[in-house]
Amino acid sequence: MKIGILALQGAFAEHAQMLEKLGIESVELRNLKNFQQHYSDLSGLILPGGESTAIGKLLRELYMLEPIKQAISSGFPVFGTCAGLILLAKEITSQKESHFGTMDIVVERNAYGRQLGSFYTEADCKGVGKIPMTFIRGPIISSVGKKVNILATVNNKIVAAQEKNMLVTSFHPELTNNLSLHKYFIDICKVA
């Protein structure tokens, strides 16, 4: 099994380290040719945290947005953390247009405020158990469609969800030593 990691910005190296600990090979995807070259060998894709507006702009400039969107729309498993969650959202409250727009969620960017508003907590996550959660100016999911399964909440705010083969978190599981969510994603990839 091999997992692609969008490597335009953000914590892509940390996701690769998590996968390595699980014995899973990964490949960094930096441009369209790179994505096309590896796509048929991939079992899934991770969209890491970072700055969603910058990543969205790069995806468009590198002509990667539509091919990746088509793959996700056809059932290709994807795990979006923080900015990756925003990229997948059907609607972003502070923006006119979405990026991939494949997941039936409405997202509020930077809901957890500035860098100083970042925090760490632990909470239960369906299918995984109690896990550590590191929030860095994280978004929140303000509403979900009928087919979206809410996996975790913190202070009554949705911070993890799944719709079919799309898994998202507002927090950064790659910045902890807990492999549970990455294992959960690998299980999604195995049955996809």
Curated annotation (Swiss-Prot):
The chain's disulfide connectivity reads none
Tell me which InterPro entries the record gives: Class_I_gatase-like (IPR029062), PdxT/SNO (IPR002161), PdxT/SNO_CS (IPR021196)
Keyword tRNA-binding present in the record's keywords: the answer is no
Any idea which GO molecular function terms this record carries? glutaminase activity; pyridoxal 5'-phosphate synthase (glutamine hydrolysing) activity
An example of a Gene Ontology cellular component annotation for this protein is:
cytosol
Q: Which SUPFAM superfamilies match?
A: Class I glutamine amidotransferase-like (SSF52317)
Q: Does the keyword Acetylation apply?
A: no
Q: Which CDD domains match?
A: GATase1_PB (cd01749)
Keywords of the record, alphabetical order, are: Glutamine amidotransferase, Hydrolase, Lyase, Pyridoxal phosphate
- Entry EC no(s): 4.3.3.6, 3.5.1.2
Question: Single Gene Ontology BP term?
Answer: pyridoxal phosphate biosynthetic process
Its annotated pathway?
Answer: Cofactor biosynthesis; pyridoxal 5'-phosphate biosynthesis
Summarize where L-glutamine binds, as residue positions: 50-52, 109, 136-137
Per its UniProt record, what Pfam families does this chain match? Answer: SNO
Name the reaction it catalyses. aldehydo-D-ribose 5-phosphate + D-glyceraldehyde 3-phosphate + L-glutamine = pyridoxal 5'-phosphate + L-glutamate + phosphate + 3 H2O + H(+); L-glutamine + H2O = L-glutamate + NH4(+)
Where are the catalytic residues?
A: 82, 172, 174
Q: What does this protein do?
A: Catalyzes the hydrolysis of glutamine to glutamate and ammonia as part of the biosynthesis of pyridoxal 5'-phosphate. The resulting ammonia molecule is channeled to the active site of PdxS.
Q: How does it assemble?
A: In the presence of PdxS, forms a dodecamer of heterodimers. Only shows activity in the heterodimer.
* Listed NCBIfam families: PLP_synth_Pdx2 (TIGR03800)
Q: Which PANTHER family match?
A: PYRIDOXAL 5'-PHOSPHATE SYNTHASE SUBUNIT SNO, PYRIDOXAL 5'-PHOSPHATE SYNTHASE SUBUNIT SNO1-RELATED
Q: Which family does it belong to?
A: Belongs to the glutaminase PdxT/SNO family.
- Protein name, entry field: Pyridoxal 5'-phosphate synthase subunit PdxT
| Protein species of origin | Haemophilus influenzae (strain PittGG)
